[in-house]
Amino acid sequence: MHAVFFDLFETLITEFENNQRKATYSIKDLGIDEKLYKKEWAARRGRRMDGSFPDHQSVLRDIVKTCGKPINESVIESIHQERIKAKSVPFKNQDSEIMNMLQTLKDQKIKIGLISNCTAEEVEGWKESIFADLFDDVVFSYKIKRAKPHSEIYLTACDHLKVSPKNSIFVGDGGSNELQGAVAVGMKAYQATWFQPSFISEEIFGFPKLQKPMQVVDLVK
């Protein structure tokens, strides 16, 4: 194998601790019922991930407008900054096994890439994180206007590292049908379960499950 590509959330970092989010933020100042907000937020997921919305603030404006509320730019900016803070928390205090695994791959001259479905504010913490220097390339969905499981995001990642899909491995928790997407372009796909409770990891079938990060190293031997 020439390269290993990783998912980000719930694969390299986790947003949860003791079954609760490590950090949260409030949207109450928008004046929208929380259940309604969550429904509208979820309805825009695809367009958030593929960059159709240029930024987080534009999503908030669209939701506020749809709900018939007045747009308050200072409130929107305040919520935006709080979301950035919350989303930066998981990039701190990384799992030592994951860091050892990545460093071992690096020492073995295996190329390391990231393929993440994300929006800009969700990965503000990446550039200052310990991961930044270990990865040869990162592909964020919002930047290339394609999200997993679309074939283009995997092929773009392979092209950046000058490797073929058949000589590449993809490791992810399985969200967004990312494992199916990786296999469809010729990659070997493995499910990372180390951050997942069993009732979630067992919902995904057909892919080898990795319980510990260092198992990734064995795949490239």
Which residues are covered by each model-predicted region?
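N-terminal helical cap/lid subdomain that shapes the substrate entry/recognition surface
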Residues: M1-N100, D107
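Asp-based, Mg2+/Mn2+-dependent phosphohydrolase catalytic module
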Residues: M1-V4, N93, M99, Q103-K106, ...
